[in-house]
């Protein structure tokens, strides 16, 4: 699996691994790269079965497999310790990494994540699956922004959304891979294991997220023994894209604080 690694800004700079959501594309984090790369060595990647890491995924593909294959390729690249920033599905992969490789994960940042899928989120995905079956990739892609962005943000950026739709359709991961990744997301349940995650965790959520209710992050915060929660009042599910200034400030401050907190505890 191919990774994209930025040059370390200084010797022994901490490593931050960015894990996107169901779309799987490393480019999702473009609004964060410039600021993160000033302080950290940043790892981005297209998840297996998407983008420049094409593959046919098994029917029983799981979050645990996503975590294992990422950890293995990081170790192969000489990276043994790393912070994880995960969005939605990426936050699930981050929690799995923290459980399975506790000596490697220094800090976890969960963006609009959850312990187990909420009934509302499941309903949203059921609607999207019906669109996929009835209208194919184009229907899935055209509906996706409705679940990601606030309405006023979309209305002011119609040409941009049209360009994003065309790009997403051209690089669509394929129906089978998408459904197998979605099923892995729906099966994931950390409600009985979250208290075993010992690394410090920053939880960021948006109160206007249409896809994942912010209450999911409150449940996550209550379940994680060493966590702090920040709420963005605006931004939707893709709040790091729609309001990068607010998000980046929260992320940079959180990473610096939690990494310092971890070092002080060692």
Swiss-Prot record:
GO terms of biological process kind: nitrogen utilization; uracil catabolic process
Keywords: Hydrolase
SUPFAM superfamilies from the UniProt entry: alpha/beta-Hydrolases
Enzyme Commission number(s) from the entry: 3.5.1.-
Pfam families: Abhydrolase_1 (PF00561)
Domain of life assignment: Bacteria
Gene Ontology CC: one annotated term: membrane
Keyword Transferase: no
GO molecular function per UniProt: hydrolase activity, acting on carbon-nitrogen (but not peptide) bonds, in linear amides
Domain AB hydrolase-1 residues, every copy: 14-115
Reactions this protein catalyses: carbamate + 2 H(+) = NH4(+) + CO2
Similarity annotation: Belongs to the AB hydrolase superfamily. Hydrolase RutD family.
Role played: Involved in pyrimidine catabolism. May facilitate the hydrolysis of carbamate, a reaction that can also occur spontaneously.
Name of the protein this chain belongs to: Putative carbamate hydrolase RutD
